[in-house]
C-alpha cells in the first residue's frame, strides 16, 4: 500500500528472457490507469451499494460513484429515511447535464413514516431523471402515482414498475420502449393500461403480473411490434374475477405465457407468428364447475382460443388446461396443431388417458415431455381405451418419478406400443420402487425396434 493508503489491484509479470533483469519482476497497476469513463461503464452493471464498496479501493475513485450514469438503490439499505433521501439528492445534483442510463429505486414502507412526503419526493426524482433522458426506469414504490411526464419520455427503453399507480394519460408517446414489466400495478381503469401498451411503438416484451384490485376488467393488448407476452392473473379466487377478459391482438407475437384460472375469456387475434406458448388456464372451471356442452358461447370461446394457438411450434400445457381441452373434445373435434413439434404436458395423477385425445390433433409432434400433478377435485370421467398412433413421435421423457403403479405402466405401454419411429424414451424412477418398475418396463413390447429406453 502506498502513502495514500490506496489498495491497488496489481498484476505481476515476469520479465522476458531477453530482459537484462531476468530474475526480477515488475507490477503494473492496470486497473488504476483505466479511463474513468470505462470504469463507470463497468460499475454500471453493479448495484450502487456495490459500486461504493469498490470505490474504496482507491482514493482516486472515492467520489466516482456520483459519476456512474445510473442509480440502483433500495431504501432498506439505509437505517434512516432522511439519509436515503439525501443520498439520492446528492447523486442527482451531480453532473446534472449528463444522461442517465438507469434509475432503479426500491421502497421500504417501514422506513418511511409519512407516505405522502415519500411519494412527493419520488415524483420529484422521476421528473428529474426523465429530464436527464433516462433509458431504464425501475421503481418499486407502494401507492405512488406515476407522474404524467413518464408517458412522454422519448429516451425510455425499459419500464419496470411494482406496486405503483398508473393514472389515466392524456397522451402516451414512448417511441423507444422495448420492455415493460408491470408487477402488482394499480390502474385508473382499463383504458390507462391499454393506452400505455399501444403508445409504445417498438415494444418487444410485455410482462404483466396483476394485483387483486387493479381496476382492469377487460385487458386489451394491442401492439404491432410485440414479440413476447407473459400474463399472470390475480392470485385471489372469487366471483368478482369471473368476468375478466383478456384480448390479445399482436400480429408479430412469438412467445406467449398465460397463467390464470379465473379469467373467463382469452381472445387471440392475428396469431400466425406464434412460436412458443405456455398455457395454464381453465376458463373459470376452477370452482368445481363442470364443462357444460350446452353452453354454446363458452364452447365457441374455447374453440376460438384453441384455433388461436394452433399454429404454435413449442407448447407447454398445465393439467387444468388439458382437462378443459378433453372436455371440449367430447363435444366437437379439436383443431389440428400441424406445426407443433415439442409438447410438454401435465395431467392429474392417473388421468393420463385424456392425453391421446389431444395427441391425435398433433400429427407432426416429435418430442413429448409428460408429468403428473396432484389430483385436486372430481372431474369428468374419462373414456378409457382411446388410442391413437403416434406416427411422428421420436423422443419422450416422463419427468415425474414413477413408482410402478398400474396407471403408470399403462402410460409407458401406450407410448411404447403406439410409437413406430420412437428413438428414445427417458423415464425417471422413484428410488423406493426402482427395481420393481425397471422389471415391468423392460418387459413392455416396443413398436419401434430402434427405441432406446433410459431409466434414471
UniProtKB/Swiss-Prot annotation:
Database matches in Pfam families: F-box, FBD, LRR_At5g56370
Region Disordered: start-end pairs: 1-23
Keyword Repeat part of the UniProt annotation: yes
The FBD domain, residue ranges: 377-429
All copies of domain F-box, residue ranges: 28-74
Keywords per UniProt: Leucine-rich repeat, Repeat
Chain positions of LRR repeats: 136-163, 185-210, 234-260, 347-372
Domain of life: Eukaryota
InterPro entries from the UniProt entry: F-box-like_dom_sf, F-box_AtFBL13-like, F-box_dom, FBD, FBL13/AtMIF1-like, LRR_dom_sf, LRR_FXL15/At3g58940/PEG3-like
The keyword Cell membrane appears for this protein: no
Name of the protein described by the UniProt record: Putative F-box/FBD/LRR-repeat protein At1g66300
UniProt organism field: Arabidopsis thaliana
Taxonomic lineage: Eukaryota, Viridiplantae, Streptophyta, Embryophyta, Tracheophyta
Amino acid at each position: 500500500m502506498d502513502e495514500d493508503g490506496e489498495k491497488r489491484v496489481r498484476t505481476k509479470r515476469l520479465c522476458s528472457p531477453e530482459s537484462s533483469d531476468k530474475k526480477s519482476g515488475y507490477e503494473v497497476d492496470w486497473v488504476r490507469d483505466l479511463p474513468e469513463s470505462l470504469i463507470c461503464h463497468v460499475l454500471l452493471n453493479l448495484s450502487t451499494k456495490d459500486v461504493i464498496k469498490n470505490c474504496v479501493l482507491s482514493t482516486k475513485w472515492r467520489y466516482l460513484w456520483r459519476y456512474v450514469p445510473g442509480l440502483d438503490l433500495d431504501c432498506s439499505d439505509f437505517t434512516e429515511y432522511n439519509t436515503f433521501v439525501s443520498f439520492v439528492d446528492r447523486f442527482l445534483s451531480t453532473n446534472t447535464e449528463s444522461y442517465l442510463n438507469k434509475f432503479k429505486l426500491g421502497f421500504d414502507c417501514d422506513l418511511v413514516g409519512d407516505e405522502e412526503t415519500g411519494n412527493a419526493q419520488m415524483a420529484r426524482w422521476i421528473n428529474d431523471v426523465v429530464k436527464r433522458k433516462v433509458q431504464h426506469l425501475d421503481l418499486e414504490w407502494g401507492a405512488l402515482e406515476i407522474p404524467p411526464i413518464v408517458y412522454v419520455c422519448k429516451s425510455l427503453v425499459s419500464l419496470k414498475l411494482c406496486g405503483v399507480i398508473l393514472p389515466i394519460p392524456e397522451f402516451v408517446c414512448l417511441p423507444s420502449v422495448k420492455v415493460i414489466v408491470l408487477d402488482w400495478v394499480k390502474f385508473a381503469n382499463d383504458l390507462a393500461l391499454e393506452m400505455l401498451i399501444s403508445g409504445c411503438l417498438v415494444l418487444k416484451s410485455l410482462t404483466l403480473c396483476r394485483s387483486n384490485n387493479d381496476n382492469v376488467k377487460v385487458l386489451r393488448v394491442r401492439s404491432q411490434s410485440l414479440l413476447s407476452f407473459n400474463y399472470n392473473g390475480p392470485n385471489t379466487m372469487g366471483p368478482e374475477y369471473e368476468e375478466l377478459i383478456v384480448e390479445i391482438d399482436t400480429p408479430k407475437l412469438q412467445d406467449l405465457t398465460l397463467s390464470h384460472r379465473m379469467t373467463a375469456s382469452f381472445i387471440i387475434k392475428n396469431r400466425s407468428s406464434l412460436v412458443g406458448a405456455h398455457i395454464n388456464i381453465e376458463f373459470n372451471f376452477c370452482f368445481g364447475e363442470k364443462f357444460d356442452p350446452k353452453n354454446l358461447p363458452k364452447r365457441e370461446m374455447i374453440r376460438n382460443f384453441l384455433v388461436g394457438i394452433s399454429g404454435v411450434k413449442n407448447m407447454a400445457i398445465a393439467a387444468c388446461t388439458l382437462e378443459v381441452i378433453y372436455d371440449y373434445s367430447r363435444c366437437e373435434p379439436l383443431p389440428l396443431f400441424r406445426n407443433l413439434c415439442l409438447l410438454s404436458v401435465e395431467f392429474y395423477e392417473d388421468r393420463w388417458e385424456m392425453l391421446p385425445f389431444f395427441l391425435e390433433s398433433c400429427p407432426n409432434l416429435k418430442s413429448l415431455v409428460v408429468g403428473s400433478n396432484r389430483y385436486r377435485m372430481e372431474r369428468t370421467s374419462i373414456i378409457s381405451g382411446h388410442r391413437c398412433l403416434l406416427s411422428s413421435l421420436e423422443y419422450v421423457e416422463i419427468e415425474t418419478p414413477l413408482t410402478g403403479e398400474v396407471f403408470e405402466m399403462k402410460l409407458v405401454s401406450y407410448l411404447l406400443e403406439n410409437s413406430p419411429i420412437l428413438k428414445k424414451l427417458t423415464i425417471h424412477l422413484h428410488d423406493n420402487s426402482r427395481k420393481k418398475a425397471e422389471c415391468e418396463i423392460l418387459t413392455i413390447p416396443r413398436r419401434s425396434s430402434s427405441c432406446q429406453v433410459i431409466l434414471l
